Amino acid sequence: MSRSRINGNFIDKTFSIVANILLRIIPTTSGEKEAFTYYRDGMSAQSEGNYAEALQNYYEAMRLEIDPYDRSYILYNIGLIHTSNGEHTKALEYYFRALERNPFLPQAFNNMAVICHYRGEQAIRQGDSEIAEAWFDQAAEYWKQAIALTPGNYIEAHNWLKITRRFE
């Protein structure tokens, strides 16, 4: 049984109904429909915290999906799971791969910045201010890109850039 059929969440059910209607009326190939079904089931599993199941669905969606734009969102969601699991190196890899296919994902830039900022904080706790500054500088670059794509968003990041004199 498709995961979306067993999910009890109202929003997920609504999304599934709308997605199923769209799949019927929009001309798509069977492969595209199957890829979307895996993607939808991956999102459902991810929203419930079932990351292993979500990853399986996303990997299947990646195998079937050919559109670079759609692939970027699959890769982004895989990055989110790795971030949630504390696998920051893997997460950064998937965010990079998502941005290669779709450079207009401010949320990927933001998440990369958050990881870099976190690593900077870790370096400070370990007494390595030089490494910390390098991580903070990288975080600043990613936040600048996120802010450039969506002015008015990421207010806390914008304030951090101003306070740390990294905003030009």
From Swiss-Prot:
A single cellular component GO annotation: chloroplast thylakoid membrane
Keywords annotated in UniProt: Chloroplast, Membrane, Photosynthesis, Plastid, Repeat, Thylakoid, TPR repeat
InterPro entries, per the entry: PSI_Ycf3_assembly, TPR-like_helical_dom_sf, TPR_rpt, Ycf3/AcsC/BcsC/TPR_MFPF
Subcellular location: Plastid, Chloroplast thylakoid membrane
Gene: ycf3
Membrane topology: Peripheral membrane protein
UniProt key word Transmembrane helix: no
Transmembrane segments: none
Swiss-Prot/TrEMBL GO biological process terms: photosynthesis
A Pfam family reported for this protein in Swiss-Prot or TrEMBL: TPR_1
Presence of keyword Repeat: yes
Name listed for the protein in its UniProt record: Photosystem I assembly protein Ycf3
Function: Essential for the assembly of the photosystem I (PSI) complex. May act as a chaperone-like factor to guide the assembly of the PSI subunits.
TPR repeats: 35-68, 72-105, 120-153
Source organism superkingdom: Eukaryota
UniProt cross-references to Gene3D superfamilies, sorted A to Z: Tetratricopeptide repeat domain
Assigned protein family: Belongs to the Ycf3 family.
Organism: Helianthus annuus (Common sunflower)
